[in-house]
Amino acid sequence: PAWVCNKMNNALDADWFRGLGAGESAGQFTVELPQGWQTVETPVQFPVCKDRTPAWVQYVQSRRLEVTCGEAPFLASRYDAATGEMIPVARRIGILDRKLRVVSENAATEDEWRKYATHAVQSTYGYEYQGDNLLLARVNLLLTYAEHLQARWQRKPTKEELQPIANIISWNLWQMDGLHRSVPGGKPQPEAEQLDLFSMFGAAEPQPPTVSCKVKNWRKGSHGTAQNFETIQEGSTSMKFDYVIGNPPYQ
């Protein structure tokens, strides 16, 4: 349900804002209600970061991943996945929705909006095993971008504007077997064999290599750099994402 996604996304944001030393009044997108929420209509408050990238830009660029994402209800809340009921843009609580709300509240011009809205999409990731679910997730993210642009600037995006966004989404939402971190079927399963006295001491047959998934690291190169999922990291750490979320017990 969307109210569960809101509650869990709120927990991520509360942790993120605490990391900046922000007060309790900062970072409030919604007020939680029993099986629901009320949108905070005033602009989201961010702490002042002296001699650093503005806090709102850091938030927009924070990497977040939804695992086994299905239709991506944690990333984009165009509708309540439990009921199918559409959610107005102003009430949406998905990770990308929150990033785009922050961009709309802080970007002074349309060019600035498109720049940081692109950063928002670039830092929003998800993977899914089932191809049909993955298609729905990609469509949801693309329409989320389009609907936020229309809500802010009272116009629909052009095909030329949507093309690079669609390309980013096609990289950032990918098909993967999360248990083996490979493309579906990319890790061959050993066949059951009948053991005998002689084969027990023979050399094991070599297994074909696992077929890894490639994901774009948009912070490397002017158009991003394709890397194996396992090798994406930030600096000298092995951390790929600031936050990982998904249906319990994956959060």
Question: What do the predicted segments below correspond to?
Answer:
Residues 1-251:
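SAM-dependent methyltransferase catalytic region
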